[in-house]
């Protein structure tokens, strides 16, 4: 009986590295699909034809629907992939740069994230229950990433203590959503000024949130 099972398994699984190559190909297609969806949504809105996304990704229409039966499934996946990319960049930057520079570069990455998120805004703010878990996902991934960079910069004495990661995310988002926030050059310049403000008087703590409105 065992021999038969083994033979059947050998028939189903290609030899050598073929299964691994198949997994790599599948992952590559998924990355291409999500990137294509992001670009199409940014250009044409979240109601853009799925066929347009498939053509840009170089996959069949059936592939899109097999992975994402509903349009909302695709939108959620695109949003989460952008959040993950932004969050994962924190550890990479922390290795490559000194603490203050790593924090500054990550904040510019967050500016890029907000820019890409704009193409999904109509769906994310529609009130559809399909997107209700996304704010929690955003906070779960991005707040710890920023907090680690921020705490490291504070410990190194290059950023003022007393700054909350959540406040910093909101500050950057506010700058990006201002009258000229949609202009990448403007948003980057404003965030660079914000970073300079964090560095100024690095040994002077900022009042914690509970004391700010007394």
Predicted regions and their residues:
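Basic, helix-initiating cap at the start of DNA-binding domains
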Residues: 1-56, 73
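Helix-turn-helix/winged-helix DNA-binding modules
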Residues: 45-46, 66, 160
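C-terminal peripheral helix-coil segments that are non-catalytic and often amphipathic
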Residues: 1-17, 112, 144, 148-159, ...
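A secondary-structure capping/hinge motif
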Residues: 72-74, 119
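Short linear capping/connector segments at secondary-structure termini
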Residues: 123-131, 208-211
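Short hydrophobic/aromatic patch on the recognition helix
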Residues: 58-68
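Hydrophobic alpha-helical connector segments
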Residues: 77, 88-116, 131-134
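Alpha-helical DNA-contacting segments of helix-turn-helix folds
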Residues: 75-82
């Amino acid at each position: 009986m065992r021999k038969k099972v083994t033979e059947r398994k050998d028939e189903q699984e290609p030899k050598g590295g073929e299964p691994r190559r198949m997994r790599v190909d599948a992952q590559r297609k998924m990355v291409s699909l999500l990137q294509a969806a992001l670009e199409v949504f940014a250009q044409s809105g979240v109601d853009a034809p799925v066929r347009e996304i498939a053509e840009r990704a170089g996959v069949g229409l059936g592939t899109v629907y097999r992975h994402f039966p509903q349009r909302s499934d695709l939108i959620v996946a695109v949003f989460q992939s952008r959040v993950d990319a932004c969050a994962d960049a924190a550890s990479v930057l922390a290795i490559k740069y000194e603490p203050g520079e790593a924090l500054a570069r990550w904040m510019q990455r967050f500016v890029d994230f907000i820019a890409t998120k704009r193409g999904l805004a109509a769906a994310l703010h529609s009130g559809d229950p399909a997107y209700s878990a996304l704010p929690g996902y955003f906070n779960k991934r991005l707040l710890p990433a920023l907090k680690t960079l921020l705490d490291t910069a504070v410990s190194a004495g290059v950023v003022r203590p007393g700054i909350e990661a959540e406040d910093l995310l909101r500050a950057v988002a506010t700058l990006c959503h201002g009258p000229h926030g949609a202009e990448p050059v403007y948003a980057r310049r404003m965030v660079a000024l914000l970073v300079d403000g964090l560095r100024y008087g690095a040994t002077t703590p900022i009042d914690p949130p509970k004391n700010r409105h007394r």
